[in-house]
Amino acid sequence: MPPVTTALIAANVAIYLLQMAQPSLAVPFALWPLGASAASNGQVSFQVWQLLTYGFLHGGLVHLLFNMFALYMFGGALEQVVGSRRFTAYYLVSVLAAAVTQLLVMALAREIYPTVGASGGVFGLLLAYGIYFPHNRVYFLLVPFPIKARVFVFIYAAIELFLGVTGTQEGVAHFAHLGGLVGGGLMLAYWRRGRLLRR
């Protein structure tokens, strides 16, 4: 497995173990809403480092395992194609884009709760995998047979949009997932534009 993918998985697992040992240590590193209203409730307010640190925290073992499996499944192949430096930048941009999206959603909804998880970065990887390996076949939980990666990306994004708009699955940051996907898409477009300009 490529080095950055390995390091990301190791870091997420190690940090999760620290969370389990001392849950309070993770609180200031989760993504909290903008403004002072969170602090007024005796909670932690937004800090700039949370835009990235939240992506290394998880809400439970299943949450962690799902994201790490996806990181292993999609990340390794992508890192080998784009290189470790670009892969790192791409992943972190996806995490950052997901965070910004979630902050906007929380501000509009006027809700105060922390957000954690690597899912924003994972959704960015999912998009890139579908673009770089469109004909590779992957398994989707709701479909009993493998489907092409590009189809998988479209279906999963559509489901996330539906769940986010309808609010039928609470406790999941669906728009943050989509934000990570969009952020990854913008990064890919930037790379493509750079290649075209150099021709």
Regions found by a protein language model. Give the residues of each.
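A detector for small-residue-rich transmembrane helices and their helix-helix packing motifs
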Residues: 1-199
